[in-house]
C-alpha cells in the first residue's frame, strides 16, 4: 500500500505578489537614500492629543473597523488642521482613543467615540501595509 498523500490533497498556499528590489545604489550613497533607510521609529506607537471645540471638525477621516479585520485607519488628514499639526497622517492605524481599544471596534462605534469626545488622546502607529490592504479590499 502506498502511504504517500495524493497530489490533489496537498494544501494550496498563496504567496504575496513579488516586489522588485530597489535599484542598486553604491554603499556610500545608501545612508541618504529612502529605499535603504533603516530608521524604524516612524512605525512605533505614539500618542496624539487633540482638543475639539463644540461643533468643530476633527480634521481627519477614518476607514475600516471590525468588519475589515484590519483595524481603524486614518484615511485623510485635512492640511493645516489641528490633526495635521499634531502629526496624524494617512496610513496611521488608530490603536486606542481615550483608553478605548480600537483594534477590534465597529466603524460606527469608532465614529461615535471620536465625534462625541471634546479632548482626544489617540494611540496610533504608522502602518501603511495594512492600510493599503484595507483600501484594496474596499475598492473591489
Swiss-Prot record:
Keywords: Cell junction, Cell membrane, Cytoplasm, Membrane. Residues 47-129 form the PDZ domain. CDD domains: PDZ_PDZD11-like. It is found in: Cytoplasm; Cell junction, Adherens junction; Cell membrane. GO terms for biological process: neurotransmitter secretion; pore complex assembly; regulation of synaptic assembly at neuromuscular junction; synaptic vesicle transport. One of its GO terms (molecular function) is protein-macromolecule adaptor activity. The keyword DNA repair does not apply. GO terms for cellular component: adherens junction; basolateral plasma membrane; cell-cell junction; cytosol; pore complex; presynapse. Its main location: cytoplasm. Interacts with ATP2B1, ATP2B2, ATP2B3, ATP2B4 and ATP7A. Interacts with PLEKHA7 (via WW domains) at zonula adherens; this interaction is essential for the interaction between PLEKHA7 and the ADAM10-binding protein TSPAN33. Interacts with SLC5A6. PANTHER family: PROTEIN LIN-7 HOMOLOG (PTHR14063). Mediates docking of ADAM10 to zonula adherens by interacting with PLEKHA7 which is required for PLEKHA7 to interact with the ADAM10-binding protein TSPAN33. This is PDZ domain-containing protein 11. It comes from Bos taurus.
Amino acid at each position: 500500500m502506498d502511504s504517500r498523500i495524493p497530489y490533489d490533497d496537498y494544501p494550496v498556499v498563496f504567496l504575496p505578489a513579488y516586489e522588485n528590489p530597489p535599484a542598486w545604489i553604491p554603499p556610500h550613497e545608501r545612508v541618504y537614500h529612502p529605499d535603504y533607510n533603516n530608521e524604524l521609529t516612524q512605525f512605533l506607537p505614539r500618542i496624539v492629543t487633540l482638543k475639539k471645540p463644540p461643533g468643530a471638525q476633527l480634521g481627519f477621516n477614518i476607514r475600516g473597523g471590525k468588519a475589515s479585520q484590519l483595524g481603524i485607519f486614518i484615511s485623510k488628514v485635512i492640511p493645516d488642521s489641528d490633526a495635521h499639526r499634531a502629526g496624524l497622517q494617512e496610513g496611521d492605524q488608530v490603536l486606542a482613543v481615550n483608553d478605548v481599544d480600537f483594534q477590534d471596534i465597529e466603524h460606527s462605534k469608532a465614529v461615535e467615540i471620536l465625534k462625541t469626545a471634546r479632548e482626544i488622546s489617540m494611540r496610533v502607529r504608522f502602518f501603511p501595509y495594512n492600510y493599503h490592504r484595507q483600501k484594496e479590499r474596499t475598492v473591489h
